[in-house]
Amino acid sequence: MKMTVAITNHNQHAMVKETIELLLSSATKPAHIYVLSDGKPFWDFTGDPRVVPLNNTGKFTGRCGNRNSVIAPFLESGDDAIVFMDGDCFPDTPDFLENYAILLDNHDLVFGTRRHTPVTGLHMPPSDLLTANMDNLYHCEPLNYADLRLVSGAVGAWRNSRTFSERLDLMLTGMIGWSCNFGFSRNGLERLREFQKSTYGLDEGIFDSNAFQEGWGYEDVAMGIDALYAGLDITITDGVRVGHHSHDRSDGLFDHVKGRHAIMERYRGLEKASESWEWVKRAAIVASAFFTGGLITGLVTCAITMQSMMGIN
């Protein structure tokens, strides 16, 4: 499987260089590594033709635009799958890409997990790390640096879910679709883009910069919800884990309110569209039944008439 790796970069050059070195030295090597920069320009230091800097400006900046910038190059490359990583993350195991290749051969969309590095010396540690360690902090016990989604049981809940409603509930909590570490098969990405284009008119990528250009995050949660409604095969696993260079968080206590509101608005819109589409399908079935019923009645009548005529003769 030929794989693309896309690394977002906002003035995180030193960390990105370390990640590139790890990827190029892994047993399963990427066909392309795109560095998506919307801050200071990034210049390739390896001389390796697989490393492609995309120094973005204009509409290809910000959380959505920067990631969207790699969609067209990936699709043009002919590679089979694409893995996205944040610039402050690095592969946490030597078989990182090998495991992704196996997973993306069987799933459309894969969310991996992340492990935080020690937070010694930080004034405002990552909020998800604090949430995962509320009990530990209260009892003055050592911190657990594992992913909040593992600690909370969200990964296990997704694995045990059986219905669309169960998975939708998990997606809406924001505890599945994180953009720090995820991957698409080519087919899964193309299907998601078709769904988003027909639903929102989105045609430049998979992250909706119109709905999520302000406030804190949640464009990744929205992408996951879209993928669920598009019918993609989605999994989340600790089998593809990144390490996260812990740093002081940049979000405040109420920064997530606007993002949560946008998510619920998106969900309500998708539900309405889904209900409308269900009505159209049911109407088509009824119309088909009437048409088919009328046709059958006509054929039966014709057959009876012919038999009657043959009997007379």
Q: What are the functions of these language-model segments?
A:
Residues A146-G156, T163-F184:
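A recurrent flexible, glycine/aromatic-enriched loop bordering the glycosyltransferase active site
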Residues E214-A222:
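Acidic donor-binding loop at a coil-to-helix junction in glycosyltransferase catalytic cores
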Residues M1-L22:
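N-proximal low-complexity "stem/linker" segments adjacent to membrane-targeting elements
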Residues E21-P30:
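Short, acidic, metal-binding catalytic loop of nucleotide-sugar glycosyltransferases
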Residues D79-F90:
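Short beta-strand-to-loop acidic/aromatic patch adjacent to the donor-nucleotide binding site
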Residues V110-L130, D135-L137:
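Short beta-strand-to-loop element that shapes/binds the nucleotide-sugar donor at the catalytic cleft/hinge
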Residues T57-F74:
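Glycine-rich, basic loop-to-helix element that forms the pyrophosphate-binding segment
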Residues C89-I102:
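Acidic donor-binding/catalytic loop of UDP-sugar-dependent glycosyltransferases
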